[in-house]
Amino acid sequence: MKKLTILFCLSLFAACHSDQKEFRRALAAAGENRQQLEQVIEYYKHDEADSLKLRAAVYLIRYMPLHKSYDTAIEKLYDRIDSLIPNCKKNADSLAGAISLLYDRFKPSLNTLFDIRTVTADYLIRNIEQAFDLWQTKPWAAHLEFGDFCEYLLPHKCIDLQPLTDWRTELADLYDGELGMHTNEAWCRKLISTGQVVGLPS
């Protein structure tokens, strides 16, 4: 039994050390943007009540080197796609073809940027605050353990290459009433935990 306890403690120490190493690598990968990430840590590290938010910030930063976003040029493509929809509502194939042609035309002007090098402290802090607000106030999210919260509710964007916009506010304006009014709490929990709700990664 003593050997098992020692082995467990060693593996726990190794996991924590690995997490810290990934976090330090992420800060190094940020280059000149490192100061923005450090501002997020600084914002949460002084108040004991924010200890979970600090852990959430570290989680986001640790995995951020894996993610990229389109720059603002993608907005022009989105606007063009939006203008196609009324004309192609009845024919999904023609809409898909038109979108494909538009994408091919816009692709040379679309640049991708590493999130770790471009995200601002304000953006991450707002994202963390909004995610915690959902977790603490919405019945469909209250059942999530911290690990599930980090995986499904905390991410700073829905999909890779998504521009760094205020998407949470936009989705809340569109869908909050629908989720908030749903009476089948078990259904909502299942939907959230499997990542099937708009705005959550699957």
Which stretches of residues belong to each language-model region?
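Bacterial Sec-dependent N-terminal signal peptides
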Residues: 1-23
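N-terminal accessory/pre-domain segments preceding catalytic cores
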Residues: 16-201
